[in-house]
Amino acid sequence: MTLEKIKKYLISKINIKFIEIYDDSQFHHYSKKGLTHLRIIIISDDFINQTLINRHRIIFSMLSKMIEKKIYSLTLNTYTLNEWKDKKLKKTSNVKCVKKNNIL
């Protein structure tokens, strides 16, 4: 599984205005296992009148078979085009996990 494969698959399923997928695996202690932590920003007017949880359900249901048992963490940022413009978001911040004394 590659980031490009995930991107193409999502584009084929919903009307996406913008999509960016980031591999945040290097920020986590699981990074030696390959692609484990993803962050996806999706802008689509298919999200109009959808609650945040429903937007995430839509994406999770599309990706469930692709990421099952492979991805440890999936962060979704889902917006309509107007929401994206209103917030003037360019990129979400990275979440950095710190492992101290084997406790996260």
UniProtKB/Swiss-Prot annotation:
Coiled coil: none annotated. Gene3D superfamilies: BolA-like (3.30.300.90). Signal peptide: none annotated. It comes from the Bacteria. It holds the Pfam family BolA. InterPro entries: BolA, BolA-like_sf, BolA/IbaG_stress_morph_reg. SUPFAM superfamilies: BolA-like. Belongs to the BolA/IbaG family. This is Uncharacterized protein BU473. The lineage of its organism: Bacteria, Pseudomonadati, Pseudomonadota, Gammaproteobacteria, Enterobacterales.
